[in-house]
């Protein structure tokens, strides 16, 4: 897939970004690893995640997506250097409020 410049950051990403909100929610760790392997094999290099992903699922606290991504990176030396990882912090979905303020 052709990569595009991300503004003036020097980063190059495909026009599609993979959503990591499914990790630890609708797909388990093993399925997540398979999806991430396929993503990298096909030349995609951008993944979106957030600390609140899957916090809405019973038994989850949030952070499941990052935990699975961290385990996958640990099991795949060199993969982290190939991936552009987008994340967000500061929201509390249960309280339905923003915890951090922007300036």
Curated annotation (Swiss-Prot):
InterPro entries documented for this protein: AKR_Detox_Biosynth, NADP_OxRdtase_dom, NADP_OxRdtase_dom_sf
GO CC, alphabetical: cytosol
Pfam family for this entry, one: Aldo_ket_red
Coiled coil: none
Alphabetized PANTHER family for the sequence: NADH-SPECIFIC METHYLGLYOXAL REDUCTASE-RELATED, OXIDOREDUCTASE-RELATED
Descriptive protein name: Uncharacterized 11.2 kDa protein in crtE 3'region
